[in-house]
Swiss-Prot record:
It catalyses: ATP + H2O + cellular proteinSide 1 = ADP + phosphate + cellular proteinSide 2. Its EC number is 7.4.2.8. Pfam families: P-loop_SecA, SEC-C, SecA_DEAD, SecA_PP_bind, SecA_SW. The gene is secA. Belongs to the SecA family. The keyword ATP-binding applies. It is a peripheral membrane protein. It is found in: Cell membrane; Cytoplasm. Gene3D superfamilies: Helical scaffold and wing domains of SecA (1.10.3060.10), P-loop containing nucleotide triphosphate hydrolases (3.40.50.300), SecA, preprotein cross-linking domain (3.90.1440.10). Part of the Sec protein translocase complex. Interacts with the SecYEG preprotein conducting channel. Has a central role in coupling the hydrolysis of ATP to the transfer of proteins into and across the cell membrane, serving as an ATP-driven molecular motor driving the stepwise translocation of polypeptide chains across the membrane. This is Protein translocase subunit SecA. GO terms for molecular function: ATP binding; metal ion binding; protein-exporting ATPase activity.
Length: 835
């Protein structure tokens, strides 16, 4: 084990040694950079850009560019980056993660690679977790970049399209991760390329990279529209679930957070809803609503998972403790919680476009990130994002005192000890930061401190508006600050001069399921070589301890006759807690990896559709593409109607009817002409006739209008079909895990079925576009926007007359009968698709 650790450590050491040599090169350039005037320093930017056009690379420019930024930072910001910050900048430029401890100046470090990569003119995105940090960094660090002649933009949620375009056109753009993802999705829903805001994704530096790429990796960004569904079922399911008793009617597994009806519960449901079998296919919706109501009542807790604010359910981010306004749980869980809390139930939504942060950020040519805590997730960063974690040494050694955990028998004993510790430290004037996992814990400690007469600030999702002010005051003498999780991350706690010698005390009220979050809390103390102390208080009733078998420990404490006020300080327990955390982290990583495997199926499909949309938007003339679609549609129709081996069984009448109804006019293609041809020869005369009709249509209107009409039709069909496909893939995903019971790998099944559904969607797109182009009359002065919304297109009269049902030769096949082609599928899912 020690050998492995040494090996890992050595890899990091080797990287540091290598970067140290580059730092020495940068230092050696200082005497030639320092004497330059401000104008000469700014002129370096133009010089670098010219050198890039002549064939030099950004790697060649690195030492000189970093030396220029260091000198500019000293002049403009009054801050001179240390050697370790230069190392952090090199690691970022190379597309890695710089692990730099709290207070080591990550924001200043980022200016070095940001400047260097912005010289290419392709744009650099600096990504933060919230708009406050984006605005702060853009205004503070923006001065430095503007001094050097680069343009800086900030991308905010409230901005208009024109303002966003300007922000993205800048050399450097500051933005939140959410806004970047949503802009990407919106860009792929617009109808004119002038409406796009983003440029191709070149280089991004993510601040607090673990928060965005690990904690939020499973959170999909969704743009949705309304799906009209009744809210009554939620009310009924909610009323029913209120009558259930734990363990008798349902079982709840604390470890997996799984809740399900027992036999008694199922019987109760069947009686309550007057049905014979709850698991009958026709009761799928009811069962789903009952399950979601159960989850709302048993798994989801008010003030921990969500809060009720102004008559709405607002989700609480489990990692940052912030309120996530505008976000909703999917699959009807949000509506179930609304029913539980008695607020207005809002309609379920239909997904129009979706992407996860994992897949969005993997589209950048180069990606890097900074954080104080990434080493525990190194495997994930390497495997999923191809980024190495490089631990950058601190500028001054860390002298913080990290004490062993104190473990109490009950929660009550633990909280009494926490409050006593806070009171004692407060009397001595030492500033204290108390970290809690849930909002309710922070409010409980707040009440206990108020009773003791200790003034304090509370920082949780309910009052995050004052976040920066509260954090700024947290290091002054006698300050007591209670923070949920890592609210306030990204803002440093600076110590008052009169407490520099004692430092900040950090008290953790329970261990988080992720070691990383605990390390972040510890890292708030002892920044830049300051003193500090950290202490975690645990109890046998904490969720992490409950989930991973603390019964034996509790029994031992009982046997030893230990009361609530006596903690045990045991290496064994600390190790058990750490191994429990590792297990949870492993489970969470597996879940994220699995999500990525599933999401990759949709990612590949999304890339195909978005690439086609882009081509359509940029193309001047779509006629060639549309003719290709018509050819495919005709070939599919011919194959479908001539698949029998015996010629007499071919359904030529059905083929002619199909062509007359969807593509041509009555009499354009005759049965007797086609009967003389082999199937592979039939397509040619049909396509020739189609092109003839297409030419006739071209003569009826100006060319510009025809080209616009083609675009309109393609956009309308592709967007409608793609939205329906996303919805269908959602449903497939929800039901696919049930296949595991049949000894089938659900992921492989999802990939195969998803691919088949995608192919079927492409065929359907081609057919519908061909039909619209050949059969629709268009109004003059048509607007692309109007038509995409379903106006201005009318089926022509000759198309109406030809609408005869395709005839199936010989024996009629019922929609639910097995298909005659021998595929083993039902007729409606095989040869009868679309009939």
């Amino acid at each position: 084990m020690i050998g492995i650790l040494k090996k890992v450590f050595d890899v990091n050491q080797r990287q540091i040694k290598r970067m140290q040599k580059t730092v020495e090169q940068i230092d050696a350039l200082e005497p030639s950079i320092k004497p330059l005037t401000d104008e000469q320093l700014k002129g370096k930017t133009l010089e670098f850009k010219e050198r890039l056009t002549k064939g030099e690379t950004v790697d060649d420019l690195l030492p000189e560019a970093f030396a220029v930024v260091r000198e500019a930072a000293t002049r403009v910001l009054g801050m001179r980056p240390y050697g370790v910050q230069l190392m952090g900048g090199i690691a970022l430029h190379e597309g890695n993660i710089s692990e730099m401890k709290t207070g080591e100046g990550k924001t200043l470090t980022s200016t070095l690679p940001v400047y260097l990569n912005a010289l290419t003119g392709k744009g650099v995105h600096v990504v933060t977790v919230n708009e406050y940090l984006a605005q702060r960094d853009a205004s503070e660090m923006g001065q430095l970049h503007e001094f050097l002649g680069l343009t800086v933009g900030i991308n905010l949620n409230s901005m208009s399209r024109e303002e966003k375009q300007e922000a993205y056109a800048a050399d450097i753009t500051y933005s939140t991760n959410n806004e970047l993802g949503f802009d990407y999705l919106r860009d792929n829903m617009v109808l004119y390329k002038e409406q796009c805001v983003q440029r191709p994704l070149h280089f991004a530096i993510i601040d607090e990279v673990d928060s965005i790429l690990v904690d939020e990796a499973r959170t999909p960004l969704i743009i949705s529209g309304q799906a009209q569904k009744s809210t009554e079922l939620y009310m009924f399911a909610n009323a029913f679930v209120r009558t259930l008793e734990n363990e008798k009617d349902y079982s709840f597994d604390v470890k997996t957070k799984n809740v399900m009806l027992t036999e008694d519960g199922i019987t109760k449901a069947e009686k309550a809803f007057h049905i014979e079998n709850l698991f009958d296919l026709k009761h799928v919706a009811l069962l789903h609503h009952i399950n979601q109501a159960l989850r709302a009542h048993v798994v989801m807790h008010r003030d921990t998972d969500y809060v009720v604010q102004e008559g709405e359910i607002v989700i609480v981010d489990q990692f940052t403790g912030r309120l996530m306004k505008g976000r909703r749980y999917s699959e009807g869980l949000h509506q179930a919680i609304e029913a539980k809390e008695g607020v207005e139930i809002q309609n379920e939504s239909m997904t129009l476009a979706t992407i996860t942060f994992q897949n969005y950020f993997r589209m950048y040519e180069k990606l890097s990130g900074m954080t104080g805590t990434a080493k525990t997730e190194e495997e994930e960063f390497r495997n999923i994002y191809n980024m190495n974690v490089i631990v950058i040494p601190t500028n001054k050694p860390i002298i913080r005192d990290d004490r062993a955990d104190l473990i109490f028998k009950s929660m009550e004993g633990k909280f009494n000890a926490v409050v006593e510790d806070i009171v004692n430290r407060h009397k001595q004037g030492q500033p204290v930061l108390v970290g809690t996992v849930a909002i309710e814990t922070s409010e409980l400690i707040s009440k206990m401190l108020t009773r003791k007469g200790v003034r304090h600030n509370i920082l949780n999702a309910k009052n995050h508006a004052r976040e920066a002010d509260i954090i700024a005051e947290a290091g002054i003498k006698g300050a007591v600050t209670i923070a949920t999780n890592m609210a306030g991350r990204g803002t440093d706690i600076k110590l008052g001069d009169d407490v520099k010698n004692v430092g900040l005390a950090v008290i953790g009220t329970e261990r988080h399921e992720s070691r990383r979050i605990d390390n972040q809390l510890r890292g708030r103390a002892g920044r830049q070589g300051d003193p500090g102390v950290t202490q975690f208080y645990l109890s046998m009733e904490d969720e992490l301890m409950r989930r991973f078998g603390s019964d034996n420990m509790k029994a031992m404490m009982d046997r030893l006759g230990m009361d609530d006020s006596q903690p045990i300080e045991s290496k064994m327990v600390s190790r058990a807690v750490e191994s429990a955390q590792k297990r949870v982290e492993g489970n969470n990583y597996d879940a994220r990896k699995q999500l990525l495997q599933y999401d990759d199926v949709l990612r590949q499909q999304r890339e195909v559709i978005y690439k086609q949309r882009q081509e359509v938007m940029e193309s001047e003339n779509l006629r060639g593409i549309i003719e290709g679609m018509m050819k495919s549609t005709v070939e599919r129709a011919v194959a479908l109607h001539t698949q029998e081996e015996i010629e007499e069984d071919w359904n030529i009448k059905g083929l002619v009817d199909y062509l007359n109804t969807n593509l041509l006019q009555e009499g354009d293609v005759k049965e007797e002409e086609l009967r003389r041809l082999a199937p592979e020869e039939m397509s040619e005369p049909i396509i020739a006739k189609l092109i003839e009709r297409y030419n006739d249509k071209e003569k009826l209107m100006p060319e510009e209008q025809m080209r616009e009409f083609e675009k309109v039709v393609v956009f309308r069909v592709v967007d409608t079909k793609w939205t329906e496909h996303i919805d269908a893939m959602d449903h497939l995903r929800e039901g696919i895990h049930l296949r595991a019971y049949g000894q089938i790998d659900p992921l492989r099944e999802y990939q195969m079925e998803g691919f088949a559904m995608f192919e079927s969607m492409i065929a359907s797109i081609e057919e519908e576009i061909s039909r619209y182009i050949m059969k629709a009359e268009i109004e003059q002065n048509l607007e692309r926007q109007e038509v995409v919304q379903g106006e201005a297109v009318h089926p022509s009269s000759d198309g109406e007359e030809a609408k005869k049902k395709p005839v199936v030769k010989g024996e009629q096949v019922g929609r639910n009968d097995l298909c005659k082609c021998g595929s083993g599928k039902k007729y409606k899912n095989c040869c009868g698709i679309g009939k």
